[in-house]
Amino acid sequence: RRQRQMCIRDSSLYIVLGKERVRFSLMPVRELRSAYKESLPLFVSILSTQIYVNVNKLVIGSFLGMLEVSIYDMADKVLLLMKLPASMIAQAVFPKISREQNIRFINHVMFLSIGIALLFYISMFFGSDWLVYLLAGEHIEEASVIMRLLGISAILTSINGFLGGNRLVPLGYSSVYMRVMVGNCLFFLTAMGLLWLTGSITMYTVTVMAVGVEVFCFVSLVYRNWRLGL
């Protein structure tokens, strides 16, 4: 097996360096610094988003228990499926948006994404009991409620994606987008801190907070787009 790996490695190097004549070169420090400055807002934005999206399960596990974590995780997995169409659409049209910078096209795709998210949410809302039984093997009323509450954020995410990452970023406002995402993260951490100080951390309050962050993000993005005339 090791010999096979070495053979594959050597063959790959021969093709890249010998046949295709690819040559490696050191990037000038000035270009590296410029690329770093350009990518920093997006890096900070993604990091901030990951914090307020993924910390919920950690908080529930730390303050409540594994049963609550499993219930929230089940609802979160359904939420990820609901977000998937909007995410795929956003990725597919991003090159076209960056190239043409057509706000009318962005709005058209955004409303299409919202419509799909609404359809998914309505289906999930009326079929949540069946989904819980399918995934858990039993009826859990709390899981159905959490799933319905958390599903609202799928609609908000489909809007926020086209107000932020697919509008501000390709139109040259990456730093504005970064400030909005950092603001969302700070809002989430502040609200979670207040819940902790008041002893109000429950599965329902954490879920409402997750939706509340998306509402805050929506308001922030609408305000920023309005100020920029987008």
Regions found by a protein language model. Give the residues of each.
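Short, small-residue-biased leader/transition segments that mark boundaries at the very start
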Residues: Q3-I8
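Interhelical loop/hinge segments that connect adjacent transmembrane helices in multipass membrane
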Residues: R9-V53, A92, K96-R104, R227-L230
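Alpha-helical transmembrane segments of multi-pass membrane transporters
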Residues: R9-Y14, A117, M124, R179-M203, ...
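Transmembrane helix-bundle signature of multi-pass secondary active exporters and lipid flippases
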Residues: T49, Y72-Q91, F120, L150-T157
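Helix-loop junctions and terminal segments of transmembrane helices
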Residues: L79-N102, G164-P170
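Membrane-interface junctions at transmembrane-helix termini in multi-pass inner-membrane proteins
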Residues: S98-R99, A154-V182
